[in-house]
């Protein structure tokens, strides 16, 4: 078992934290906004660890669902499950254990949060199979990656206001943007094996669609900032996020594989500076109030 542990870590992408960070930033945005910038630190820890566990479980299930496809894709052919280094039942078992541990984390929270976690588990578990049926599975991914948003509001406020769903919509558009960049890397392989992705669905309009999704995401956050009366600290973070999106255009405009992958990875910075702007606003507002 210990000898296989490094393989299990690769299966759940512990060597590639970018996915966990892309889940974490929107969840932190929600926690800070829901609590007016004063989230309880145990709650932050629960959601941060839960995000890591559920992303890891999702990776295991994704590899299980795609095991017959991944061997035909150069980038994924050496994954532990695809290459036969671990067995299919091991991936399912790991996903189940991680999901169970994540559920244990939220047991101290209110009933609504636990009920939403069941929905989140269903969405996360079913996402890997959407690529067979749905022309833009990245939109479904956005729901899966963003379900920490309504859960965060539920945990803090005991209800899920309209603002939480608006933030979830923003996350869907952001996910379509960055995961289309990711899908552009595998475009040729996906055509060959018949998997549906937004990069194929958008076709020659892929770059335009990505930039439109960034515009909608940042437009929604601008509306949130204006509605909630956020100050200059937020707008500085928002402007930095806009700069990141414009930088991504320079990377993806020629549709080359490695620059597209670099744009995908750079979304960590976009999410990070946007959260930094939100957190900084509450920090400045709190200092001014004192």
Curated annotation (Swiss-Prot):
Gene Ontology molecular function: any one: 4-hydroxybenzoate polyprenyltransferase activity
Principal location: membrane
Cofactor: Mg(2+)
InterPro entries reported for this sequence: HB_polyprenyltransferase-like, Prenyltransferase, UbiA_prenyltransferase, UbiA_prenylTrfase_CS, UbiA_sf
Transmembrane segments: 41-61, 89-109, 133-153, 158-178, 202-224, 269-289
Membrane topology: Multi-pass membrane protein
Recorded superkingdom: Bacteria
GO cellular component entries: plasma membrane
Keywords: Cell inner membrane, Cell membrane, Magnesium, Membrane, Transferase, Transmembrane, Transmembrane helix, Ubiquinone biosynthesis
Involved pathway(s): Cofactor biosynthesis; ubiquinone biosynthesis
HAMAP family on file: UbiA
Cross-referenced NCBIfam families: ubiA_proteo
UniProt similarity note: Belongs to the UbiA prenyltransferase family.
PANTHER family: 4-HYDROXYBENZOATE POLYPRENYLTRANSFERASE, MITOCHONDRIAL (PTHR11048:SF28), PRENYLTRANSFERASES (PTHR11048)
Protein's recorded name: 4-hydroxybenzoate octaprenyltransferase
Gene for this chain: ubiA
């Amino acid at each position: 078992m210990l000898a296989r542990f490094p393989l299990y870590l690769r299966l759940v992408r512990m060597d590639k934290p970018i996915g966990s960070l892309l889940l974490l930033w929107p969840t932190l945005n929600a926690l800070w906004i829901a609590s007016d910038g004063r989230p309880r630190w145990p709650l932050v820890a629960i959601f941060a660890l839960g995000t890591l566990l559920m992303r890891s479980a999702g990776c295991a299930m994704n590899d299980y669902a795609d095991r017959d496809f991944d061997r035909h894709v150069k980038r994924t052919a050496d994954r532990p499950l695809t290459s036969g280094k671990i067995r299919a039942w091991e991936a399912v078992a790991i996903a189940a254990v991680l999901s169970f541990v994540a559920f244990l984390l939220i047991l101290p929270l209110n009933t609504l949060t636990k009920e939403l976690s069941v929905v989140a588990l269903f969405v996360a578990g079913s996402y890997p199979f959407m690529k067979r049926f749905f022309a833009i599975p990245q939109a479904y991914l956005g729901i899966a990656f963003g379900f920490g948003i309504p859960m965060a509001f539920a945990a803090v406020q005991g209800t899920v206001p309209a603002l939480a769903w608006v933030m979830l919509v923003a996350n869907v558009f952001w996910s379509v943007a960055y995961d289309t960049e990711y899908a552009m890397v595998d475009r040729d392989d996906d055509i060959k094996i018949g998997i549906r992705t937004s990069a194929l669905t958008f076709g020659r309009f892929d770059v335009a669609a990505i930039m439109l999704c960034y515009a909608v995401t940042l437009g929604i956050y601008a509306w949130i900032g204006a509605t909630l009366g956020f100050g200059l600290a937020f707008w500085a973070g928002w402007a930095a996020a806009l700069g990141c999106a414009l930088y991504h255009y320079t990377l993806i405009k020629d549709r080359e594989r490695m620059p597209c992958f670099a744009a995908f990875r750079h979304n960590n910075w976009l999410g990070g500076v946007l959260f930094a702007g939100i957190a900084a606003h509450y920090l400045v507002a709190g200092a001014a109030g004192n």
